[in-house]
Each structure stands twice: as C-alpha cells, then as structure tokens.
Amino acid sequence: MRLYDNYGIIRSEIPIVSYRSHHILFENNTMYFSISNKKIVGMEQTGYVSKIYDTGNYKLHHDYIFDSNNNILVLASEKEAKTSEDKIIMIEKDSGNITELADLIDLLPNYYSTTSLPDGAENLDWMHINSLALVDKTSLIISSRETSTIIKLDNIYSNPSIDYMIGSDHFWKESGYDSLLLNKTSDFSMQAGQHCVTYVEDNSLPQGQYYLYLYNNNLAVSTTQSDYDWKNDSNYSNTYYSLKKGTSYYYKYLVDENTRTVELVSSIPVAYSEYVSSVQELDGNVIIDSGIAMSWSEYSQDGTLLKTFKTTGGKFVYRVFKYDYLYYWFQ
C-alpha cells in the first residue's frame, strides 16, 4: 500500500502479505486495513500491529466498513461454495467472531436460477458485489457489477430483505424483480459495471432523500447472463459493451425513498476504466481513480480538472483515496 502526497511523491509504503488493501478505516488511534484476502489488521501509530482478524471460512474482497458498533462488515466469498462474491459477513471487533449476515442467493433466488457458469470459470460470480455503505444503522447499500445494479438491503442483522434497486427494468423483468426498481425522473443513461457506490446524508434535504455517488465504469457486460442483449436495452446510451476505448463517469444520484425515484444530479466524464476504479468526495472536491488507465485525478464539484497523476507498472491502480491522518500521524 503506497501513500502519496499532493505532489505525487511517495511518502510511505506499508507492506502487506498478498492481495490488496482496499481502503483504510480509523478508530481510536488505530488504522485498519486488509493485508490479504483472509486477514484485516489494526495498526497503531508506531507501526505496531495490535489487532489481527481472520475471516475464517470466508475470503474477503472489494470492501469492508465499520457498522454503528464498530464491528467490521465485509464483502465475502465462502471458501467451499460454488459461487463467489455474493455474501456479507460481520467480524465482531472485540471477539473476532464471524457471523454471516446476508447471502444474495437467499434474496434473489429467481434471478440466481437464470445465471450460468462462463466457460473456464471456477466459481459462479453471478452478482460480483463490489462496495458497501451503511445507512441508518441497519441498512446497507451494495453495488453489483455483474448486474449493473445498486441494491439497498434492510434489516441486515435479523431478516435481510431488499428495499429497492437501481438498475434496468428490462434486465430484471425476466426474473420478476423489476417491481423493486426505483423510477428515473428523467431520461439518462444508467450506471453500467459501476464501483464504489457511496452514501451521503445532507441535512438540507427532506427526510427520505439522500445522495449516492459512484464510479460509473460505463461497461455493460454480464458474463453469467451471456444471452442478455445490453445493446438493445433502452436504459443505456453512449455505453460500451466491450473492453475497447470509451468514457467512464463520476455519477451522483439523488434518491427519494418517499416517491421511489432516482435522479442524476451530477456527472463528470473521466478516463475510461472498464473495471475496478474508485471515487471520493472530500473537502468540496472529487478524487477519481480510473484504475485500468493507471491514473487518478482531483476535480472541483463543477467538473474542473485540478490535477492528474499517472503511473506505470502492474495491471491497474485498484483504488485511490485521500486521507489527512489527523490525530493519527498529525495533529
């Protein structure tokens, strides 16, 4: 894991075992991050690793967050299962005990039954959940790359259920889940293959409204639904259907749970990245990583480019986030 300053100079490198560190969580002068697909550690300010959490019978992937009790919620794959990247677990922060909170097969059984294993694949990656966001203590917003859909889950600790989805009504109609979709308030091209969906409360909004922002990779592909014709889906325009050159976007949605609607309120075109990538709103600006393009940039909210960094080597820059390390390394 590499730490750069605002001038693009490497200031620190933190070694890990394997896989990747997806992002950093802070709590009580301890910094938490993954060091493999099996372990998350807590590192103190001196560099001493004081906490080690093992994911047990699961492998972590893509994202983890604190819940309202500072337990760690983790996107996971069960090690011996035939499917992958479709479960959510909780690691109790004090004990390290693991609880499976949600299995997407239980929530979307009809859709699951329509998917098929691609040629050469070892596991059925039928949802490919790639981000987590906590809402009102007991709800989660998750992102499914494989279905180009954003999903809100309620009652995650007791009896999980789907509150709504943001995606294509044509895509979901066959399996009968199209009634869960929010309605678009205007004609815009929906997110495709998105990453890093982030929940934002805003006290200026009426109750039941909030923002979601995300990296819209803008690649409409579903390897476990190979017969679906994304090109003829009227929910998409200027969207790409192969790994060739294109344009990706920062998207910001206004969600209104009262009217069950979603509105695109902001969009910034960025370097194309068919997979991976991240976006972060911070101090009035937007930090955007186009992972496959090996570049990351900072923009003002109106889309003015402030700075861009590029690097070489490796396959991609998985994610880029900006931290001030206040009260951790700096006062």
Regions found by a protein language model. Name each.
Residues 1-331:
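Histidine-/acidic-rich catalytic cores in large beta-rich domains
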